């Protein structure tokens, strides 16, 4: 499936979903070209950004890290700065969500296709890892309570999970396997906290667009009429480690 950016792809996917299709989607990729000498070319875009002055540094840092070239920077009225970048299209994949977070919803980002240019080299999209279910079963409050210390959860108690499914976002860069089906062992000794209710942070429920932005190159988004699930391409943990 090909389209003009993540928004166009999400519309196509949502239409297929409503028609009853069940399928898996990998991370969006750009279409490369090659010149007459066999040199790899990639699509480039011009990005025009209006952002409050205090957030301009974060935006510049993020886009230069995504192979963007700052071509213009000028002050605007009301304490805003206008930035102009030339950036590979793949550098914008998954960025809009980060942009909204970094600017606290106060930034404006518009892009237009420029041309095909020389390939800019490898790029790392995500700086956080995934929390991966270790075994199949039903998510238990106790297991989720221990897991939420690692990062942001995507599921709530009672949801069915299987080995290899992504149940949350790790606060650190690496992936971690966790057991969200873990139950508390019963003992004859009553602990002082036995009667305390375990409180869970409200899980993050991602939209289709957010899920498409989130998935990494080794992950898939499972799309069904009822659910959106993120999983590893290789479900078995042993095989996944060998492949890595």
Residue ranges and their predicted role:
Residues 1-244:
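Accessory interaction regions appended to the cores of large information-processing enzymes
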């Amino acid at each position: 499936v090909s389209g003009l950016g993540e928004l166009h792809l999400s519309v196509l996917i949502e239409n297929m979903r409503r028609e009853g299709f069940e399928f898996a989607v990998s991370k969006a990729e750009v279409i490369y070209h090659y010149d007459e000498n066999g040199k790899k070319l990639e699509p480039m875009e011009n990005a025009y950004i209006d952002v409050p002055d205090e957030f301009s540094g974060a935006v510049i840092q993020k886009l230069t890290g995504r192979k963007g070239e700052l071509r213009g920077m000028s002050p605007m009225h009301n304490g805003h700065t206008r930035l102009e970048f030339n950036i590979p299209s793949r550098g914008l994949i998954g960025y809009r969500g980060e942009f909204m977070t970094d600017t606290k919803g106060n930034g404006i980002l518009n892009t237009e296709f420029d041309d095909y240019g020389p390939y800019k080299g490898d790029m790392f999209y995500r700086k956080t890892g995934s929390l991966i279910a270790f075994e199949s079963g039903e998510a238990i409050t106790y297991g989720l309570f221990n897991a939420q210390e690692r990062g942001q959860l995507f599921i709530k108690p009672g949801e069915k999970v299987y080995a290899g499914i992504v149940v949350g976002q790790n606060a650190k860069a690496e992936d971690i396997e966790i057991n969200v089906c873990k139950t508390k062992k019963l003992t004859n000794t009553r602990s002082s906290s036995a009667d305390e209710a375990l409180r869970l942070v409200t899980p993050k429920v991602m939209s289709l667009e957010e899920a498409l932005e989130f998935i990494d190159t080794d992950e898939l988004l499972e799309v069904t009429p009822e659910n959106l699930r993120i999983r590893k391409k290789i479900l078995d943990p042993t095989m996944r480690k060998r492949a890595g």
